[in-house]
């Protein structure tokens, strides 16, 4: 297993990590309700994906408590 021979300085570490970036999620429009949604996922507004309605995708404001 590779082990670093010398300690990497703080500036070199930060310069190396500066290239790590999160990519923004690509949004598409829902064909049914025209709301923005993520690709390959059911619409959070109407719950449709590929012409089918999924009840689990519909969000509710009420939170169930046990």
Curated annotation (Swiss-Prot):
Region: Disordered, residue numbers: 1-20
Family indicated by similarity: Belongs to the bacterial ribosomal protein bL32 family.
GO cellular component terms listed in the entry, alphabetical order: large ribosomal subunit
GO terms for MF: structural constituent of ribosome
Record key words, sorted: Ribonucleoprotein, Ribosomal protein
Transmembrane residue ranges: none
UniProt key word Zinc: no
Organism: Beutenbergia cavernae (strain ATCC BAA-8 / DSM 12333 / CCUG 43141 / JCM 11478 / NBRC 16432 / NCIMB 13614 / HKI 0122)
Compositionally biased residues, Basic residues: 1-19
Taxonomic lineage: Bacteria, Bacillati, Actinomycetota, Actinomycetes, Micrococcales
GO biological process, one term: translation
Pfam families noted in UniProt: Ribosomal_L32p
Identification of the protein by name: Large ribosomal subunit protein bL32
Record gene name: rpmF
Signal peptide: none
């Amino acid at each position: 297993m590779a082990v670093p021979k010398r300690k990497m300085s703080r500036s070199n570490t930060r310069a190396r990590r500066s290239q790590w970036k999160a990519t923004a999620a690509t949004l598409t429009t829902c064909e049914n309700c025209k709301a923005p949604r993520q690709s390959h996922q059911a619409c959070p507004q109407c719950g449709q994906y590929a012409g089918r309605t999924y009840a689990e995708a519909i969000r509710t404001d009420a939170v169930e408590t046990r």
